[in-house]
Amino acid sequence: QTYSIIQKLWLFIKLFTPMCITQFSLIGGTFIAIFLTGQYSTIDLAGVATGYNLWLLFYIFAQGTLLGITPIISQLLGAKKTDDISTIFYQGLYIGTGLACIILIIGLLGLRPLLTALNLEPAAAEVCISYLKAFAIGLFPLLWVNTLRNTVDSHGLTHYSMAIVFTSFIVNVFLNYSLIFGHFGFPEIGGVGAGYGIAGACWTNFILFSLVLLLHPKLKGYRIFKDFSKPSFHYIREQLHIGIPIGFSI
């Protein structure tokens, strides 16, 4: 509880700083990937840049939609109805899984026709397709992590998100550098390596956030990943009712 303006400002800074560093880490990974790909070849740069902009469009909407869990959990915490948090958490995972499946189907059916319509050079189009295939390995954990991170952040544990996302940023940079140029015994695969770098970072995020949910004293009482909850149309609809407008507004 805070009583003075200084205390409120300090609390805001404590919450805002980790979130700010988290966002810079998320953006920084992509910047490094595109920069390194540009150093490798212009064709790979064109393919990766096109692929990045395509998946980012869908991801921003999905990320906004999955934000619907945050106010629900915050409300439950305020009302001290924590028994329902585990159920809400699983509905977020189900929504993330559904969104990932939709994105995959759209990609499988529409990617090549779209690249043809964009008149992308054939060599760059092949790099784009291979990059997105590599990225797809991390698509499910990428969307699951939104639910995990939002749950952690709802409990005021934003410093964990900062540490985890920064760690995944390091993993992303390492895999990008290693796979694009073929360093440290890794194969040289050019721009496609940027896709594997993102996928590796996504799985790193998922594993580390899962460990926080399983081990942190504030969170382990929910028995997440131990007591599974079936899909609930009521809770899924509630999250989508809040999240979809956020997704469109972003």
What positions do the PLM features span?
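Small-residue-rich hydrophobic transmembrane alpha-helices
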Residues: 31-34, 45-108, 142-161
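Short, well-ordered alpha-helical segments in soluble proteins
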Residues: 132, 141-144, 148, 152-159, ...
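Short alpha-helical transmembrane segments in multi-pass integral membrane proteins
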Residues: 1-19, 73-140, 186-244
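Alpha-helical transmembrane segments and their lipid-water interface positions
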Residues: 22, 26, 30-33, 59-66, ...
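Transmembrane helix-bundle signature of multi-pass secondary active exporters and lipid flippases
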Residues: 17-71, 135-142, 237-250
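Alpha-helical transmembrane segments of multi-pass membrane transporters/permeases
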Residues: 96, 151-178, 192-195, 199
